[in-house]
């Protein structure tokens, strides 16, 4: 059995709201651009809504395809977050 697609995320409790952080959505390249990602996002939204979530957050690769996909699903670029990172050892990236 092959795994063609999955969503991975977790719940975050803030003072006044419950959020869901969409950590990863993966679709096998054979199934991309066929509506599966949109269907997964919708199913995830339905599930987290039932559990009381009022905000979904994510971070994404900064390219046109990813931005278009998430905007098409109703997400927006948040002005109040700055992605940051720190390498803990030398890397070629």
Task: Enumerate the language-model features and the residues they cover.
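Conserved hydrophobic beta-strand within the GNAT/NAT acetyltransferase core sheet
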Residues: 22, 56-60
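Short beta-strand-to-coil "C-cap" segments at the C-terminal boundary of structured domains/repeats
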Residues: 85-92
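Conserved active-site alpha-helix within GNAT-family acetyltransferase domains
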Residues: 38, 50, 54, 62-80, ...
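Acetyl-CoA-dependent GNAT
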Residues: 1-17, 23
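Short hydrophobic clusters on alpha-helical segments that form packing/core surfaces
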Residues: 22, 44-48, 66
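Conserved acetyl-CoA-binding loop-helix of GNAT-fold acetyltransferases
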Residues: 27, 33-46, 72
């Amino acid at each position: 059995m092959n795994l063609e697609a999955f969503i991975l995320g977790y719940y975050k409790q803030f003072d006044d709201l419950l959020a869901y952080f969409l950590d990863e959505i993966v679709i096998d390249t054979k199934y991309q651009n066929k509506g599966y990602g949109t269907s997964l996002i919708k199913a995830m939204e339905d599930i987290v809504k039932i559990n009381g979530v009022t905000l979904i957050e994510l971070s994404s690769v900064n390219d046109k395809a990813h931005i278009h996909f998430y905007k098409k699903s109703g997400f927006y670029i948040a002005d109040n977050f700055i992605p940051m990172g720190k390498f803990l050892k030398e890397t070629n990236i």
